[in-house]
Amino acid sequence: AVRSFGAKILLHGDNYNESSKKASSIAKQKKMELIHAFDDPMTIAGQGTIGKEILDAEDNLDAVFVPVGGGGLLAGVSAWIAQQKKKVKIYGVEVDDSACLTEAVKANKRVKLREVGLFADGVAVDQIGLHTFDVIKECVDGVITVSIDELCAAVKDIFEDTRILSEPAGALALAGLKKYASKMSNKKLLAISSGANLNFERLNYIVERSEVGENREKLLSIQIPEKPGSFLKLCRVFGRSQITEFNYRFCLLYTSPSPRD
């Protein structure tokens, strides 16, 4: 889609921060205009039109859930909805291993994360935007964090309902909605789904982790004695619970010989 408008695409780095630094460097060297991915008033305003679309399409909403990376989408949508219908609550949703907004809210100032998880690479940002944070503080009702397992379960939900494969970041808002809905009832909730940039190799991992995210499976790491009957005793502990997969690793501890030996 981008190439169809005549743009040149340069792939650089393994995450957003590396790509952003490269883009800033090129813009400075070639004296070009840099359009920030999220931390620009015009970018925020453009993304805010989604808020208008939501209110035009749905009435009597109780809450809207928005995925958070740098905060542009959340700032734009929350600003529009807050001005139109203040009764609608707005929640940002983050992955717990890249929760830059959550940390900023706790500190009441922008915080730069030391490490950022890359599973939901579409929202893998180490610091919330300056402009976006100013808007979010005024217009957003709360921030919800979800685990990777809960995120994978949301990807599965979208596929089962629509037969559309969402990328992890695209299913983030739904994961937050599900977590919120588990504590509420009789509420009309809406989640923004954005993004389908999913590598095929990730599908198997998502399928496995979604079972954990839906509390259908548990992953256990257990040490048992290396002697006959140990596995049978373990199975008896589980009772009627079903073991869907079992990986066994034999660990032999020994002291390596010294040069003198």
Cite the ranges covered by each PLM segment:
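Small/polar-residue-rich loop-to-helix segments that shape phosphate-bearing ligand pockets
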Residues: 1-63, 81, 94-145, 150-151
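Short glycine-/aliphatic-rich beta-strand segments at the starts of folded cytosolic domains
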Residues: 211-225
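Conserved small/polar residues in nucleotide/adenosyl-binding loops
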Residues: 254-261
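Short glycine/serine/threonine-rich phosphate/pyrophosphate-binding segments
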Residues: 1, 68-77, 100-101, 169-176, ...
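Short amphipathic alpha-helix segments
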Residues: 227-246
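Catalytic phosphate/nucleotide-handling subdomain of diverse soluble enzymes
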Residues: 179-208
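Active-site-adjacent helical/loop segments in soluble small-molecule enzymes
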Residues: 129-187
